[in-house]
């Protein structure tokens, strides 16, 4: 009986536990690549808008000529809010896209950095907030892409002979699940990193 009490009182030996299984490491590295591509898309798209000296005029023509402005679920909002303030929304779009691109790229670099061992992959206190901001950026990227797709009158992908030599899924619609996937992954990282602190 005394031996049993002794074994209960003694702490269990500590074992070194790996941070993440190899499959999770690979999945996070792959998701960082997707996140980086999404970040580059938004960063370059925003910078292209800054480089266009006639962007406000071109944005106005784009919104006016889009099918979603005439019909669709966004038409009332576009007519009551966007068109009367077109210069504001054109400028806002430029800054939002550049901001999303930067945040998504920084988040991807951070996810990639953590895949390394040693000093480079060491945990830092800023990781949870970075993951949270990157998750919000992923959601914003998905929302912005969906808004553009609805504005353009994009439809769900189907078999169409006219799209034989182009992408089957319009790029704007393809960016929506990618943004959601990034948000999901980064939100998961945030939950784990927040608990670790």
Language-model segments: residues:
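Extended, low-polarity transmembrane helix blocks
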Residues: 2-197
């Amino acid at each position: 009986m005394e031996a049993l009490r002794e074994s209960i009182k003694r702490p269990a030996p500590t074992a070194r536990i790996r941070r993440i299984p190899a499959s999770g490491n690979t999945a996070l590295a792959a998701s960082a690549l997707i996140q980086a591509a999404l970040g580059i898309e938004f960063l370059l798209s925003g910078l292209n808008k800054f480089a266009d000296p006639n962007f406000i005029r071109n944005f106005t023509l784009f919104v006016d000529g889009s099918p979603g402005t005439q019909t669709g679920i966004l038409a009332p909002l576009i007519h009551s809010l966007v068109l009367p303030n077109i210069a504001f929304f054109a400028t806002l779009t430029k800054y939002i896209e550049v901001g999303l691109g930067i945040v998504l790229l920084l988040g991807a670099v951070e996810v990639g950095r953590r895949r390394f061992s040693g000093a480079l992959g060491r945990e830092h206190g800023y990781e949870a907030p970075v993951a949270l901001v990157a998750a919000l950026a992923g959601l914003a990227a998905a929302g912005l892409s969906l808004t553009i797709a609805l504005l353009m009158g994009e439809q769900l992908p189907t078999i169409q002979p006219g799209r034989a030599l182009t992408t089957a899924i319009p790029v704007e619609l393809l960016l929506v699940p990618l943004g959601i996937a990034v948000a999901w992954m980064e939100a998961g990282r945030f939950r784990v990193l927040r608990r670790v602190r």
